[in-house]
């Protein structure tokens, strides 16, 4: 009976996704982007686009693609090599926030390279971001010192993070550390509990990435999610599959629903643990195939928007099914 119920739920979701996808495709594609922009309703899980895949384009083009895809704004890269260089944050970031607003888009999340308050750019970035309405930012990555020891490394990083939290409190902004596959801090997920447990979740937390959690945690990832649930304040959404590269196992990011992430268990757990916060949609698979990069800009935009919409429709289907919007 439970299996039948599960199958029916999945079938209903597929039909829902198919319906909204067809409806989206029926919207005339026009350069008059304003006709397609709608202001997203305020909810517990506002969706933002991690800007990295589009950073190489003109910002106006980025805004058009994002607005046409039904995404409410950006999780903007404000880090070395990002859309905004930290050294020019005071002049560049306000302009982009203003321009995004013309498309009905918010910039209330950012991805930084911040790892210490000793860098003079740290306070400049946080002060500017906070003044512009950015409420959440992702911290830079931390490394384990295997010679010093794993536990000792965590204690060192904890002391440093306390100083960052003090700055977050000063500017009323929340800093999140993303769990990421590999041997850096956050890979195992449980280590983030030790890193965060003595800090206020109002100013420091985890940007929980279920894709990376499943890569490293296989069937046990759910344990780490339960452990750090009080500190999960933003969600990074993407999918993956395993493949063999030169005889070795490797992961590849794929469109949502085409990989191995257990979305039903993930969103059910999000609801059970009463987790809420902004969602950053990571589209880290090729948006343009070989040769498509040579197409006219408008044709590129059509291809990009179609792929973004597909991910957005998939995500919205789960948010609706589990009634956690």
Label the model's feature ranges:
Residues 62-79, 132-133:
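Catalytic domains of carbohydrate-active enzymes, especially glycoside hydrolases
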Residues 45-51, 74-76, 107-112, 137-139, ...:
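Hydrophobic faces of well-ordered beta-strands that scaffold small-molecule active sites
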Residues 46-57, 111-119, 150-153:
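Active-site mouth loops of central-metabolism enzymes
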Residues 77-95:
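Glycine-rich, proline-tolerant flexible connector loops at the mouths of alpha/beta enzymes
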Residues 20-29, 61-63, 99, 103, ...:
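Active-site acidic/histidine proton-transfer and metal-coordination neighborhood
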Residues 50-54, 77-81, 112-115, 142-144, ...:
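Active-site beta-loop-alpha junctions enriched in small/polar residues
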């Amino acid at each position: 009976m439970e299996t039948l119920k599960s199958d029916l739920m999945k079938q209903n979701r597929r039909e829902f996704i198919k319906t909204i996808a067809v409806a989206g495709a029926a919207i005339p594609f026009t350069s008059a982007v304003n006709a397609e922009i709608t202001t997203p309703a305020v909810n517990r899980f506002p969706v933002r686009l991690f800007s990295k895949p589009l950073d190489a384009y003109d910002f106006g083009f980025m805004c058009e693609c994002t607005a046409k895809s039904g995404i409410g704004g950006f999780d903007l890269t404000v880090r070395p090599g990002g859309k905004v260089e930290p050294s020019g944050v005071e002049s560049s970031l306000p302009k982009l926030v203003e321009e995004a607003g013309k498309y009905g888009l918010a910039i209330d999340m950012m991805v930084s390279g911040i790892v210490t308050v000793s860098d003079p750019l740290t306070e400049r970035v946080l002060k500017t971001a906070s003044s512009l309405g950015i409420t959440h930012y992702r911290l830079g990555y931390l490394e384990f010192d295997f010679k010093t020891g794993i536990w000792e490394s965590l204690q060192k990083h904890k002391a440093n993070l306390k100083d960052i939290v003090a700055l977050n409190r000063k500017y009323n902004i929340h800093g999140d550390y993303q769990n990421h596959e590999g041997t850096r801090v956050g890979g195992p997920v449980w280590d983030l509990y030790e890193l965060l447990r003595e800090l206020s979740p109002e100013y420091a937390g985890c940007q929980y990435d279920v894709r990376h959690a499943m890569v490293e945690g296989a069937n046990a990832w759910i344990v780490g999610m339960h452990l750090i649930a009080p500190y999960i304040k933003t969600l990074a959404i993407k999918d993956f599959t395993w493949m063999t590269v030169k005889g070795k196992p490797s992961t590849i990011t794929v469109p949502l629903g085409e990989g191995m992430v257990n979305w039903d268990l993930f969103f059910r757990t999000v609801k059970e643990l009463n987790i809420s916060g902004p969602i950053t949609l990571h589209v880290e698979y090729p948006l343009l195939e070989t040769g498509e990069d040579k197409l006219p800009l408008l044709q590129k935009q059509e291809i990009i928007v179609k792929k973004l919409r597909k991910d957005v429709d998939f995500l919205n289907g789960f948010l609706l099914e589990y009634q956690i919007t």
